């Protein structure tokens, strides 16, 4: 069972429950040799860092001594590890030696027999760039074996969870086909296989394409494991694209060659030995100097280097988790991807899929949008803004520029005249920023240095396209001034207050509907005495009473509905827009203000994004409650564990 606890980009901090044991993802699974005598770092030290390890069931099965212990005492006793143990099936040996002496069903039976927590099918790891015919044939065989493995597990009611490995070489349509078929077989975890040769050749862009094309077809409610990815420099980008699990033999293999891992690359101990201290504060690097480590006999040196490599690997995973919680994972990705040109190339390739990524990126975050380079202009936050700008409807649009010396939010630092015209500021980051909503995340919750000319012209095409699509509504400076004079004159009897117009534009931008003039004139706007920003929107009710419609949240200026606001959304938007439909079994819990759990969601607006404000209804579209969705539209339809909507309040 898997649930999302925090998220940013496509990355998620998840809680994965396996045989009563809890794993927090993303995490790394250190590769452990089943023979303790061949293990570089002791299992006792690994256990202090890892909640899950991965070892090789094929090696155990083909070694009589190890096999006997595993069959009699179980794999946890063999290795001396009480937490979750995942096993590979021999696919690695198949990729190295070309053949192995085990059958697909036999290795599944063996993994179950020795008490493995998560087993792996005997897939065929197709190498990159092979002939298409070979890739198709090997994928066909992998899928056949997958079907046999699932059938065996289900018929014999095996306890172990199963990995269904995605193959297809470097043919993206085959990766999608593999993911789609594996999804139909309902595996528990989905490793993406045969990417190690690509990473060894620094072909990170191909790895990224494989991840994203696999993710397009994989279920959102199951973890994804990037098989063989063990270098920390690759973790941030991979997590941002939805990978939850990694495995690392690199910590030990690199140590044997005298290589010292960092989060941004690999150093050689030989090149460090003249330094007084290591560039790290792990226990190994505090205890020893580079010169001391270099002079040690090889076995001890390898062990200590491997320990450092393991520490730095887990440190990067923990740093990524913190970035997800803080809402600045993209900033970490942009920092990491500048460690190597090929990694930057991979990031740029990922951003070619930004419309897909945007579906999973939260609409609001704790941290501001920080510009890290030209690639930032393609991030999901900017793509979403440009799409949602189309929601704001106006018959009168005026586009203007503003001095670079004026700080955001522009509306608080300029003296534009009030009117119902849609005033758009040309902006280097977002293309066009409506003056009336420029306090909304991320339009003012952002920062950037002065941009170069090539960066400034990035949005020219977008602006020109917008002008062309709205050419009948665009006003020049003369017509705009004339319009302003008329609008503000006493002769205009239909004038609506500027605050009400601002709220109307915010409603359109956030929810996609607008209020008419009569409804706008009834709005009561309350501003903060301290900041002078709008804080509450109220409407008159019976007698002299007033009810809160929306509250503007201070950190992102989004409209958070109160009960009357939820009623308004329900009234104005057709089913299923901004709705989460729940089972009648839990209607009363929702009415009582209890959180909605995923397994009770039966329908929803498929266009929802994480952290949107939604209304909760039954199948008859009766309004039950309102709150914040923790999942997007696709996830709401696929998750069956954990919270789906954090309910603010219900309707009795």
From Swiss-Prot:
Keywords associated with the record: Glycosyltransferase, Metal-binding, Transferase, tRNA processing, Zinc
Function: Exchanges the guanine residue with 7-cyano-7-deazaguanine (preQ0) at position 15 in the dihydrouridine loop (D-loop) of archaeal tRNAs.
Active site: 88 (nucleophile)
Signal peptide start-end: none
Organism for this UniProt entry: Methanococcus aeolicus (strain ATCC BAA-1280 / DSM 17508 / OCM 812 / Nankai-3)
EC assignment: 2.4.2.48
Protein name: tRNA-guanine(15) transglycosylase
Essential cofactor(s): Zn(2+)
């Amino acid at each position: 069972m898997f649930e999302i606890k925090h998220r940013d980009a496509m990355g998620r901090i998840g809680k994965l429950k396996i045989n009563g044991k809890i794993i927090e993802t993303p995490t790394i699974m250190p590769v452990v040799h089943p023979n303790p005598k061949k293990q570089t770092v002791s299992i006792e030290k690994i256990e202090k860092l890892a909640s899950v390890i991965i070892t090789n069931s094929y090696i155990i099965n083909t070694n009589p001594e190890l096999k006997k212990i595993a069959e009699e005492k179980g794999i946890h006793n063999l290795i001396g590890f009480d937490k979750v143990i995942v096993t590979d099936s021999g696919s690695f040996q198949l990729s190295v030696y070309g053949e192995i002496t085990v059958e697909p069903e036999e290795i599944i039976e063996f993994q179950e027999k020795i008490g493995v927590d998560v087993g792996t099918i005997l897939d065929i790891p197709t190498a990159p760039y092979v002939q298409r015919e070979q890739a198709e044939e090997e994928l066909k065989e992998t899928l056949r074996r997958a079907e046999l493995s699932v059938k065996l597990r289900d018929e014999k009611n095996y306890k172990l969870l199963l990995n269904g490995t995605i193959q297809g070489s470097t043919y993206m349509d085959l990766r999608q086909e593999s993911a789609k078929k594996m999804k139909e077989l309902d595996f528990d975890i989905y490793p993406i296989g045969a990417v190690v040769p690509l990473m060894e050749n620094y072909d990170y862009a191909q790895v990224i394409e494989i991840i994203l094309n696999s993710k397009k077809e994989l279920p959102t409610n199951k973890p994804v494991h990037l098989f063989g990815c063990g270098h920390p420099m690759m973790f941030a980008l991979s997590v941002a694209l939805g990978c939850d699990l990694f495995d690392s033999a690199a910590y030990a293999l690199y140590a044997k060659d005298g290589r010292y891992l960092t989060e941004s690359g690999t150093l050689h101990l030989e090149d460090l030995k003249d330094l007084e201290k290591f560039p790290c504060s792990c226990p190994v690097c505090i205890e020893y100097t580079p010169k001391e480590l270099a002079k040690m006999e090889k076995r001890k040196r390898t062990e200590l280097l491997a320990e450092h490599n393991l520490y730095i690997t887990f440190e990067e995973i923990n740093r990524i988790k913190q970035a997800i919680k803080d809402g600045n994972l993209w900033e970490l990705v942009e920092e990491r991807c500048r460690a190597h040109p090929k990694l930057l190339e991979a990031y740029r390739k990922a951003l070619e899929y930004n419309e897909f990524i945007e579906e999973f990126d939260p609409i609001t975050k704790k941290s501001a949008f920080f510009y890290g380079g030209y690639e930032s202009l393609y991030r999901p936050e900017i793509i979403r803004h440009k799409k949602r700008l189309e929601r704001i409807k106006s018959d009168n649009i005026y586009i203007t520029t503003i001095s670079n010396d004026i700080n955001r939010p522009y509306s608080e630092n300029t003296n534009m005249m009030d009117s119902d015209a849609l005033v758009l500021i040309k902006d280097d980051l977002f293309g066009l920023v409506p003056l009336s909503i420029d306090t909304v995340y991320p339009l003012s919750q952002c920062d950037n240095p002065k941009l170069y000319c090539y960066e400034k012209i990035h949005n020219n095409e977008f602006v020109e396209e917008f002008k062309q699509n709205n050419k009948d509504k665009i006003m020049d400076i003369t017509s705009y001034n004339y319009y302003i004079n008329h609008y503000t004159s006493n002769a205009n009897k239909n004038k609506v207050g500027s605050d009400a117009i601002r709220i109307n534009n915010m409603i359109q931008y956030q929810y996609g509907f607008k209020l008419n003039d009569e409804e706008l004139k009834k709005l009561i706007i309350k501003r903060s005495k301290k900041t002078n920003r709008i804080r509450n929107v109220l409407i008159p009710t019976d007698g002299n009473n007033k009810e809160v419609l929306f509250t503007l949240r201070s950190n992102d200026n989004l409209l958070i509905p109160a009960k009357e606001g939820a009623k308004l959304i329900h009234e104005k938007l057709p089913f299923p827009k901004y709705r989460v439909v729940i089972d009648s079994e839990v209607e009363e819990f929702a009415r009582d203000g209890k959180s909605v759990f995923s397994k009770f969601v039966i329908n929803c607006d498929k266009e929802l994004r994480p952290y949107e404000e939604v209304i909760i209804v039954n199948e008859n579209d009766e309004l039950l409650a309102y709150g914040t969705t923790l999942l997007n539209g696709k996830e709401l339809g696929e998750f069956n564990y954990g919270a789906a909507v954090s309910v603010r309040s219900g309707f009795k």
